[in-house]
A protein has these predicted regions:
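Hydrophobic ligand-binding cavity/cleft-lining segments
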Residues: 7-102
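Hydrophobic/aromatic beta-strand elements that line small-molecule binding cavities or substrate pockets
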Residues: 54, 132-133, 161-168, 179-180
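Glycine-rich portal/gate segments that line the openings of hydrophobic small-molecule binding cavities
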Residues: 86-157
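Hydrophobic residues positioned within well-ordered beta-strands of beta-sheet architectures
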Residues: 50-52, 146, 162, 175-177
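A short, structured loop/turn motif at beta-sheet edges
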Residues: 58, 135-141, 165-174
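Terminal "cap-and-tail" regions of soluble proteins that handle hydrophobic small molecules
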Residues: 1-44, 167-242
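Coil-to-beta-strand transition motifs
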Residues: 45-49, 61, 156-159, 168-174
Length: 242
């Protein structure tokens, strides 16, 4: 997969920072208004924020939109992204009839199996409109925001919210990624949510479920897959869209 960037290696070694941070509904402010850096943060509620930056020379925001629409429904495509950690990917509905790249992933549920660290995870990644994360005025020519909520399929409980903001620069693009862990624990069954939410939101539960190792492994995983994507996406995009 190649060597991790220096900023990632340093963040993995550093202590996790105890501080308050904005939630996923304010992702636009976090990404666009404040200095954004690589790191792992824990707030007083024991929720965690993992942030990653990927420099993407020769990659455009449009390529990222295309990639997310293209890879969702075939495991072989998903495995290109992280050959060591990605196992399978599927959709329960066909997205091939949609015309635009964004339509092919927005409001879709992607079912994936992947390793984060040494643990195999079966997840449902539900892609949503960027407006849900506070991105109301994106310039489609210069930027795109991939936003999603993640559910653990072993218990049907939401475990994370994600955004990848991709912005044009002189070399290509820069991707800013954020993962919020434990901030919105819900079950697909609303009755069960009302019963278990107080437990899931307790500091004790979050201390057990949201570990330092999980956060560090997630940062490594994101850095590996995004830096690997940079290596082949420009050529793949040109080949498939020409």
């Amino acid at each position: 997969m190649g060597e991790l960037p220096q900023s990632i290696r340093e963040s993995i070694k550093n202590d996790i920072k105890n501080c308050e941070f904005l939630g996923f509904k304010d992702a636009a402010h976090l990404h666009q208004k404040e200095p954004f850096s690589v790191g792992i943060y824990r707030n007083q509620n024991k929720e965690m924020l993992v942030t990653c930056i990927t420099e993407m020379p020769e990659v455009s925001p449009r390529m990222i939109d295309w990639w997310f629409g293209w890879h969702l429904n075939e495991s072989e495509r998903y495995q290109l992204w992280h050959p060591k950690a990605h196992i399978s990917a599927s959709l329960k509905e066909d997205n091939s009839h949609f015309e635009t790249d964004k339509e092919k992933y927005l409001n879709m549920d992607s079912y994936v199996s992947e390793y984060i660290g040494n643990e195999l995870n079966n997840l449902c990644i539900s892609f949503v409109e960027p407006k849900q994360f506070g991105f109301s005025d994106l310039n489609d020519e210069k930027e795109t925001a991939i936003c999603a909520h993640v559910r653990d399929m072993s218990n049907n409980i939401s475990v994370a919210s994600i955004t990848h903001l991709v912005s044009r620069n002189a070399e290509g693009s820069r991707m800013q990624s954020s993962f919020w862990l434990g901030m919105n624990p819900t079950h697909t069954n609303s009755i069960l949510t009302s019963l278990i939410k107080p437990l899931l939101e307790s500091r004790l539960a979050k201390n057990i479920l949201i570990t330092d190792d999980l956060a560090r492994n997630l940062l490594i995983h994101c850095a590996e897959e995004m830096n690997h994507l940079v290596k082949f996406l420009p050529i793949l995009f040109k080949d498939k869209t020409n």
